[in-house]
Each structure stands twice: as structure tokens, then as C-alpha cells.
A protein has these predicted regions:
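N-terminal export signals
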Residues: 1-18
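Short, glycine-/small- and polar/acidic-enriched structural segments
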Residues: 20-151, 156-159, 175-178, 196-200, ...
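Secondary-structure end/capping motifs
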Residues: 34-35, 216-307
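Stable alpha-helical elements in mature extracytoplasmic
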Residues: 46, 69-72, 87-90, 137-140, ...
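Short linear loop/turn motifs
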Residues: 62, 262-274, 311-326
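Soluble non-cytosolic domains of exported or imported proteins
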Residues: 131-139, 163, 214-221, 287-291
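Pocket-lining segment of extracytoplasmic ligand-binding domains
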Residues: 158, 163-259
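Conserved C-terminal helix/tail region of periplasmic/extracytoplasmic solute-binding proteins
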Residues: 293-343
């Protein structure tokens, strides 16, 4: 069933029949347990405009779900993933190695350190802290420790999947955790003793393999057009947003065996706050020398959290990719206002 179709008839968007051999697959890495990127990826997977565009040149879309962005980096490097939704720390790693073209903003918000019975960052000393290695929340934890004059060696790091953290805190298996939404909101809802002791700003991005954009430029633009459509469609009405969040919840259930525990209204509020209400999103300005992302790069490099061959110039090049600009300035050609989502 078609969810919605506006803006005209489906037609060609510039793909040429010779642009790819038969049977090629555009493989998208997704994170079903994170909002709002899971809502976007759920829409991209159901986007019939994208499916028809790809089919004209014998391409198809496939998705691979992951619990954390750092698990996607080796596959993105090996080109087993064409594109991925990544937090800022994995994005920096991929970009600094020259392997990424950064398309646009997926999330602008904060990640949180949530503790049970803790008041300050300094209270983390000698405590067990749940975290996801090389994630945006890991960077937030490193920031917090640095501000408190603590080292990672002065806490006990407990690697956990993001959907395990709230229950681990409730069972007293850990004393605190660093995570992204919806984990932090869920923890606050579940127990009055849970409180946020630190927040750090964070961003997520849609990233395409750099070499993929060079070898298959129009396929890359077709994916970007679907990305833009997803955000436009959610902005059109609350009904659309609710549907996208329900589909995202279905993806989370399929991936982890259980639905996201927050009520629908809170999940939609996260998508609105972290993406739809962000001015100009998904557009993102290239970072300059004073940007938070440059500061993050320098901070992680000092701590030895980036590969030795990582270079800031590669990050600047990654942000220089003009795919989003092309799609937005040629919106009619790329059908960014044509919506057709499979139920």
C-alpha cells in the first residue's frame, strides 16, 4: 500500500543504464537502536521512489543493522558497506583515514552520562561505567573525565550494548552509563534515583564510502535524495512522523528482539528535537579551526583514540563532498518532494 504520493509522477532522475553492472547492491549500514537515525533508515528502506530509481539500472538496496557505529568502520573501509549512519567519533575516524564522504546531519543533540545515586562527574571515580567503545557517548565520557581531572584507568569500563544499559543500571551491575537516546530518557523515566550527571554535544551523519561516490556518483545521489525525502516527509505532518517512528520501532524489535521501551510520544519528541527542529538540517557547514568537531579531533588525537595516520585535512575533504548540495539544488530531477513508502 502506498502511504503517500505527492509532487508528480515517478520519472527518471538522471541515472544512465550503463552506470552499473547487473546485480549491484547499495548496502546501507543502520543503527536500529538509535533515534532519530533509525526513523530515517526505516523510511529509506521503504522508499519506493528509491527502489524504482535503482531498479532502472539493475541496482537494489540492502541494509545491515548494527548495534554501534564502530562495528561498521571495517566494513566501510573494505567497501562491504556503501554507506552508513555514524556518530561523530566513528565519522571522524572514517573521514580522517580518507574513506568517507560526509553527506549531511542526522542528529544534533547531546549524549548523557546517567548515574544512580551520583551527583557529580567526580563521583565516577572507582565506579563501574557502561559504555560503547569508540562511540559518540564514549567521547562524552572522555570529555567528562577530562573535566573532572580523571583518567579512564580510574573508573571500571564495562562494555555494553546500548539497549542493555538501563537494565544493567537497575540491577546494580553498573553505577553509571554513557549513552545516546533513547537510553538516557528511558533511564530517567524508570527510576527517580537515576539522574544525568553530564551532557556532551554530539552529532550523527550519513556517510558514504568515498570511493563509492567516485565510482557510482548517481547511485550515491539517489541515496541522498531518499535521505532528503525521509526528512521532508516527517516534517510534513505529525501523522508521517508517528508512522516513521513506529516503523523504526519495528526495526528495533527485529534487531534486538524487543521494542524500544519509550512511549511513542517520547520517541517522536526525540526525532523532532534532535533533527526536525534543527535549523537547516540536514545541511551541515564544513568545520573550521574553531569548530567543536575540530576540537574533538584534537582531543581524541591527544588521547591516542584516533589511528596514527588520521589527518584533519582528510576530514575537511570529507565535508567538502557536494552530493547534498546537488540534490537540493536539483530537487525536481531527484524527486525530493515525491513520497511513496511501502507499508
Amino acid at each position: 500500500m502506498q502511504a503517500l504520493l505527492v509532487g508528480g509522477m515517478l520519472g527518471p532522475v538522471g541515472l544512465r543504464a550503463a552506470s552499473a553492472p547487473s546485480g549491484h547492491t547499495l548496502v546501507l549500514g543502520t543503527q536500529p537502536l538509535g533515534m532519530p537515525c533509525s526513523a530515517i533508515s526505516a523510511l529509506i528502506q521503504r522508499d519506493q521512489v528509491l527502489q524504482q530509481t535503482l531498479a532502472r539500472t539493475q541496482w537494489r538496496l540492502s541494509h545491515r543493522p548494527f548495534g554501534k557505529g564502530s562495528d561498521m568502520l571495517p566494513l566501510l573501509s573494505l567497501r562491504q558497506l556503501s554507506a552508513a549512519f555514524l556518530g561523530d567519533m566513528p565519522t571522524l575516524v572514517a573521514a580522517a583515514l580518507g574513506e568517507a564522504a560526509i553527506v549531511g546531519l542526522v542528529k544534533q543533540t547531546s549524549t548523557a552520562i546517567v548515574g544512580r545515586g551520583l551527583e557529580r562527574i567526580e563521583d565516577l571515580r572507582d565506579k563501574r561505567v557502561g559504555y560503547v567503545e569508540a562511540s559518540s557517548a564514549h567521547y562524552t565520557l572522555l570529555q567528562a573525565l577530562n573535566l573532572a581531572g580523571l583518567q579512564e584507568s580510574q573508573i571500571t569500563l564495562v562494555p555494553l550494548a546500548v539497549d542493555q544499559m538501563v537494565e544493567a543500571l537497575e540491577r546494580n551491575d553498573i553505577d553509571a552509563f554513557a549513552a545516546w537516546e533513547p537510553a538516557s530518557s528511558l533511564a530517567l523515566m524508570r527510576h527517580r534515583a537515576h539522574r544525568v550527571i553530564f551532557r556532551g554535544s554530539t552529532t550523527d551523519y550519513l556517510v558514504i564510502n568515498h570511493f563509492f561516490t567516485q565510482e557510482h556518483p548517481e547511485i550515491s545521489l539517489a541515496l541522498i535524495a531518499s535521505f532528503v525525502r525521509a526528512i521532508q516527509w516527517m516534517r510534513l505532518s505529525r501523522l508521517n512522523l508517528d508512522k516513521a517512528v513506529r516503523w523504526a520501532n519495528d526495526e528495533a524489535t527485529s534487531f534486538s528482539g524487543r521494542a524500544l521501551a519509550l512511549p511513542l510520544r517520547q520517541l517522536t519528541a526525540i526525532v523532532e528535537r534532535d533533527l526536525l527542529d534543527v535549523p537547516a538540517a540536514p545541511w551541515v557547514s564544513p568545520p573550521d579551526a574553531q569548530s567543536p568537531l575540530r576540537q574533538e579531533f584534537e582531543f581524541l588525537a591527544r588521547l591516542g583514540k584516533l589511528p596514527s595516520q588520521a589527518r584533519w585535512g582528510q576530514v575537511e575533504r570529507a565535508f567538502g563532498y557536494d552530493g547534498l548540495s546537488k540534490v537540493l539544488t536539483q530537487s525536481r530531477q531527484y524527486q525530493t518532494h515525491v513520497f511513496n513508502y511501502r507499508e
